Amino acid sequence: MALMAVNTRCLCLFLLCTITGHSLEIKVNPPQDFEILDPGLLGYLYLQWKPPVVMDNFKECKLEYELKYRNVDSDSWKTIITRNLIYKDGFDLNKGIEGKIRTHLSEHCTNGSEVQSPWTEASYGIADEGSLGTKIQDMKCIYYNWQYLVCSWKPGKTVHSDTNYTMFFWYEGLDHALQCADYLQDNEKNVGCKLSNLDSSDYKDFFIRVNGSSKLEPIRSSYMVFQLQNIVKPLPPEFLHISVENSIDIRMKWSTPGGPIPPSCYTYEIVVREDDISWESATDKNDMKLKRRANESEDLCFFVRCKINIYCADDGIWSEWSEEECWEGYTGPDSKIVFIVPVCLFFIFLLLLLCLIVEKEDPEPTLSLHVDLNKEMYAYEETLC
C-alpha cells in the first residue's frame, strides 16, 4: 500500500510538471509600437500597432488582438477583438484617453487552451492652453427639424473684452475639419453658429471644437461629440381636430409637421383638458381616442407636441406645444335655442326701427285739421249771405 501511494504521488508530480512545462513553453509577445494618434479631426483618433515578435513555431497561427480604450474619467472600457492593425473611433478631447492591447493566440495553435500576451498601454491628451475660465460656457446644439444645426455658447467667465471664438466641425465624409461660415453674434462677438446642408451626416459622430483668440492671454478650447439624429427638435404638430362620438368617446387628430422627418419617426405627447381637469397621454400615431371623464363637461380641449421616437434615434428634444384646439359642442336643440333667441331679438328690434321710420314719413295731424276747419268756416259764411 505504501509503494502504491508513492507511485501515485510520483505520477501526479510528473503530470503537473509536464503540464506546467508545456504552459511555460507557449508564450506570445504583446503588439509592438502601440500608440494613439490624432489626425486633426477634432476627436476622431487612430489607435494603431504593429504585430508582435512571434516565435518560429507560431508563425502560421492567426493572431487576434484584444483592444480596450476609454476616456480617463469613465468607469467602463470599450472592448474590441480584431485582426487588423488599426482601429478608429471618436473621443471627447476635453478629457484624456487611455488604451491597452494584448495578443491572443488562436486555440488550434495552443491545443485548445487560451494564451494571451501581457498588456501594453498608451495614452493621449490635449495640452491645456489657457485657464479654465477662458473656456466657453453653456454650449448647446439643436438640430432643428432635421434640417439645420444651431450651436450656441456663452463667453468664458474670465476672458478679456477682445476675446472672440471660432467653431470648427467634422464628420466622416469630409476631407478635413471645416470652420463655421454663418456665425450668430452679440455685440460683434461670435456666440453661436448655424450649419445647413449637412449632407450624409446622420447616424455618424459629429465633432465640434470651439477655440478662441485674445491678444492678452491664450484661450482654452472646448470639444463636443454627438450624433445629429439624437438632438433633433421637430416643429409642433399642425391642423388639430377634436370631436366627441356617442357622447363619451373623444376623438383627436393632427397632422405631422412639414419637413424631411418621416411620419413613422414621431412620438407624441397629448394633454387633454376637460373643464378644470387635465391629463396626459402618449402615442406613436397621429390620432387618439379617449373616454370623457365627465359627460356634462362644457370645456373640452387638447394640445400636442412631438419628438423623434426610439426607432429613429436614441434621444431627441420635444417640439414646442401646438396651439390648443377645443370641441365646439353639440348642435342639438339646446344649441339651436341659444342661436335662435338672439336672432329673433335682432329682427324684433329691426321691425320696431322700421315702424318708427314709416311713422315719421306720414302727414302731421295738425295740418289736416287746419284744412278741415277752413272748409267748415267757408261753408258757414256762404249760408249767412
Swiss-Prot record:
GO molecular function, one term: cytokine receptor activity
TM segment ranges: 337-357
Topology relative to the membrane: Single-pass type I membrane protein
Alphabetized UniProt keyword annotations: Cell membrane, Disulfide bond, Glycoprotein, Membrane, Receptor, Repeat, Signal, Transmembrane, Transmembrane helix
Endpoints of the signal sequence: 1-23
Organism: Rattus norvegicus
All copies of domain Fibronectin type-III, residue ranges: 30-130, 133-221, 236-334
Modifications the protein undergoes after translation, according to the UniProt entry: Cleaved by MMP8 leading to a soluble form that is also able to interact with IL13.
Annotated domain remarks: The WSXWS motif appears to be necessary for proper protein folding and thereby efficient intracellular transport and cell-surface receptor binding. The cytoplasmic domain functions as an inhibitor of IL-4 or IL-13-dependent activation of the Jak-Stat pathway.
Compartment(s) where it occurs, according to its Swiss-Prot or TrEMBL record: Cell membrane
UniProt-listed SUPFAM superfamilies: Fibronectin type III (SSF49265)
Residue ranges of the motif WSXWS motif: 318-322
Gene Ontology cellular component list: external side of plasma membrane; plasma membrane; receptor complex
Top-rank lineage group of the source organism: Eukaryota
Record's subunit section: Interacts with IL4RA. Interacts with high affinity to interleukin-13 (IL13), but not to interleukin-4 (IL4).
InterPro entries: FN3_dom, FN3_sf, Ig-like_fold, Short_hematopoietin_rcpt_2_CS, TypeI_recpt_CBD
Keyword Signal: yes
Protein name, UniProt field: Interleukin-13 receptor subunit alpha-2
Gene name for this UniProt entry: Il13ra2
